[in-house]
UniProtKB/Swiss-Prot annotation:
Stated name of the protein: MEMO1 family protein MmarC5_0191
InterPro entries reported in the protein's UniProt record: MEMO1_fam
Source organism of this protein record: Methanococcus maripaludis (strain C5 / ATCC BAA-1333)
Highest taxon of source: Archaea
Disulfide bonding pattern of the chain: none
Pfam families per the UniProt record, alphabetical: Memo
Sections of the chain in a coiled coil: none
Family: Belongs to the MEMO1 family.
HAMAP family found in the cross-reference section: MEMO1
Length: 284
């Protein structure tokens, strides 16, 4: 299947040159890393990031911090496992798919072999295109990856995993099997957990709640993430993808996590009464 983008022209520009200008702005923005990716690194081990998925004008500079780190730690052929929440309610509880996703920068191929192996080994995972057709949380990550590819930093294939079910046990299962299949197939991989943090709360409230979950992520405490989200009613849309990413990364040997940047939509709109929180976090 060839999937067409559904939020190009809304969350990010649909035209090639306008999108390139926007991506470069995200890197060079005062809220971004303030420099463009310029060199490929040496891949020594898997890398995980937490990355936001709002409109680029709001969260793109935050996301750029994570992709800058990716560029410094990869080379050659890399499979990007991208986990995102299901906002649409379409399709199955946990799903991947095979095929190609179109972007304004060109086509991105799914690692069909990895997706098929993961589907066959992980009982909670379905092959289901419907979950992905109108979901934006994975799509908005692809232009950043394709941009790195166009800079000859790496050659990417990806595996989309859309999570409507985000309970703790299911999320841990997904993470376990990602790591298992990655080891079995000896792939160079990065794992991207797509999530925004608190939604439509005051800057003070959102920052305070988000700090609780960010602390858990930095300490690689997967169960505490789930507990804090539930206990403190934190409206983080992709806690399941984050838990799955951390489980997979720990199984692949990760020991450290660093907060690269935190910001809110209020830092753009200057309206701090109702904001959405965004964080870029590195796990390795």
């Amino acid at each position: 299947m060839k999937r067409n983008p559904v939020v190009a022209g809304m969350f990010y520009p649909a035209e090639y040159h306008e999108l390139l200008e926007m991506i470069e702005y995200c890197y060079l923005s005062p809220r971004g890393p303030k420099e463009l990716p310029s060199k490929r690194g040496n891949y020594t081990k898997p890398l995980g990031i937490v990355s936001p998925h709002a409109g680029y004008i709001y969260s793109g500079p935050v996301a750029a911090h994570g992709y800058k780190k990716i560029s410094e730690n990869i080379n050659g052929e890399v499979t990007a496992i991208i986990l995102g929440p299901n906002h649409t309610g379409l399709g199955s509880g946990i799903s991947t798919m095979k095929g190609i996703w179109k972007t304004p920068f060109g086509d991105m191929e799914i690692d069909n072999e990895f997706a098929d192996r993961l589907w066959k080994e992980c009982d909670v995972l379905d092959l289901d295109e419907n979950s992905h057709l109108r979901e934006h949380s994975i799509e908005v990550q692809l232009p950043f990856l394709k941009h790195l590819e166009d800079l000859n930093i790496a050659k990417f294939k990806f595996v989309p995993i859309c999570m409507m079910m985000q309970d703790y046990e299911t999320s841990m299962d997904v993470g376990y099997f990602i790591a298992k299949v990655a080891k079995e197939m000896n792939r160079k991989i990065i794992i991207i957990a797509s999530t925004d943090f608190s939604h439509y709360e005051s800057q003070e409230s959102a920052s305070k709640k988000d700090a609780l979950v960010i602390k858990d992520i930095l300490e690689l405490k997967d169960e505490e993430i789930f507990t804090d989200v539930v206990t403190h009613n934190i409206s983080m849309c992709g806690y399941g993808p984050v838990i799955a990413m951390i489980k997979a990364m720990k199984d692949l040997g990760a020991k450290n996590s660093n907060l690269l940047y935190y910001s809110t939509s209020g830092d753009v709109t200057k309206d701090y009464s109702e904001v959405v929180g965004y964080a870029s976090i590195l796990v390795k």
